[in-house]
Amino acid sequence: MNWAYDGTELVQRIVQWALRNDGVRAVLLTSSRANPNAPMDALSDYDVSLYVADTAPFVARGAWLADFGTVLVRFNDERDGDGMREYSRLVLYEDGTKVDFTIVPAEFLRKIAKTPNLPDYLDIGYRVLVDKDHLTDSLLPPAYRAHIPHRPTEAEFRALVEEFWWESTYVAKNLWRDELMPARYNLDSVMRYDLLRRMLEWYVEAGRGWSWKPGVFGRGLKSALPPETWSALEGTFADASIDANWHALFQMTALFRQVAGNVAMHLSYEYPQGMDTGVTRYLEKIRQME
């Protein structure tokens, strides 16, 4: 497998392919490989936006994807955004290269160039690889501010805390019933990756002036958090035994209590300790039930 970081050869192939294809009017490289401040390694994707005269030929036929290598697996997606449909072709090639192609009508790029703010996917970083019609001449430079969490209002902070403690009751109920699957769904997907992750990001942001850009699903938290906080987070992961998951639940609530209390202090908000205490007693009562 080719684990080259800079992808110079692949980028050159994409550029030459676009120059030969009259239907492709502009090509932009976006995301981490176009952001000088973003972490990048051998497994970083290539995010390539193709601005085309007509999307139909590129959407209906996928043979063009093989122009950049032997396709190992691919995934197609499409969505509406800003009144225009865009299409994704996510491709993993046999040499280990992963490219996320986005196919967009060229007129959309002209529209973006006239707006006062870049969309998030361009604000995180972009490089113009091809521009046959000068569509990007007026495009704003990236500010690299997209996806940085904003300072929550007190209502937003309170809502997240309430949801965390509410979800903990589902975990307790399902652990008592010996229902591991729903218990782990609430513990991992909801409490950890949705709620605790966001509180941990707020914790980091509060100490960095709301300027740190987290990665998806908590990427980057290990290096951003104090070692003891990361160690406490590791303690919230459990094996498949019910007892281990009870332990993980209480480890998670203890960590959340500590981090949320710290965030509340930084923001001069009130942490609802009474609710915390009451729900914790409820969880302990469920655990002790016969």
Annotate each predicted stretch with a short phrase.
Residues M1-D22, T30-L43, S49-I112:
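Metal-dependent nucleotidyltransferase catalytic core
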Residues W3, D67-P182, L187-D188, Q288:
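Conserved NTP/Mg2+-binding pocket subregion across the NTase superfamily
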Residues L10-Q12, V24, P142-I148, L233-E234:
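Short amphipathic alpha-helical segments, especially helix-boundary/capping motifs
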Residues V27, Y46, K132-D133, Y203, ...:
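Surface-exposed loop/turn and secondary-structure junction residues enriched for glycine/proline
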Residues S31-A42, D120, Y126, D133-L139, ...:
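Short, charged helix-to-loop "capping" segments that act as catalytic/coupling loops
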Residues H147-E290:
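Conserved nucleotidyltransferase catalytic core and NTase-mimicking acidic/glycine-rich helix/loop elements
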